[in-house]
């Protein structure tokens, strides 16, 4: 009976189902994880470029940033911080090198963001949005070649900086009331 009343799975839903496995999470939720399975997997490492970025520009930007000054006095980051973020490619961590990005692995991006967050929530948001909620990922998957060639280099360099807009109490989903 239930099969006759359930809606058919859409192509998008089927792709999501087929996209991968639960990997280690399945072991945890089994109630009796086989720790040897986890230990057999190689520990993820950074590329030389990623490690150099963490040791160099990430440390430098953390030293340059004063969260108290930015959030309570200036209500913005100093222009030298903005310029440094653009010059060192912080906005292009997920963008492929062929478009001017850094093409970092997710582990490197997460580590960069964790380190920056330890110093400044504002700076973390400014760098994090373009590398997560920004349009680069959408352009890479769904953009035309012309859109990618035009927009991705501008996003990677910081010439164009995307934003994330959340709706308010009188429009859209009213996120604060959820």
Residue positions per predicted region:
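Glycine-rich flavin
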Residues: 69-178
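Extended, charge-enriched "interface" segments that sit outside catalytic cores
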Residues: 1-76, 80
């Amino acid at each position: 009976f239930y099969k006759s009343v359930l809606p058919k799975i859409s192509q998008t839903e089927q792709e999501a189902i087929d996209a991968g496995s639960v990997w280690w999470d399945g072991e945890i939720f089994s109630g009796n994880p086989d720790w040897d399975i986890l230990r057999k997997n190689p520990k993820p490492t950074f590329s030389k470029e990623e490690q150099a970025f963490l040791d160099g520009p990430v440390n430098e930007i953390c030293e340059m940033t004063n969260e108290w000054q930015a959030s309570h006095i200036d209500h913005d980051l100093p222009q030298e911080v903005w310029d440094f973020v653009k010059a060192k490619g912080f906005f292009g961590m997920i963008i492929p090198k062929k478009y001017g990005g850094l093409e970092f692995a997710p582990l490197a991006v997460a580590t960069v963001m964790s380190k920056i967050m330890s110093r400044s929530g504002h700076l973390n948001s400014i760098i994090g949005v373009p590398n997560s909620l920004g349009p680069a990922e959408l352009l890479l998957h769904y953009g035309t070649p012309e859109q990618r060639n035009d927009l991705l280099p501008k996003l990677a360099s910081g010439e164009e900086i995307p934003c994330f807009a959340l709706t308010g109490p009188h429009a859209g989903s009213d996120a604060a009331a959820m």
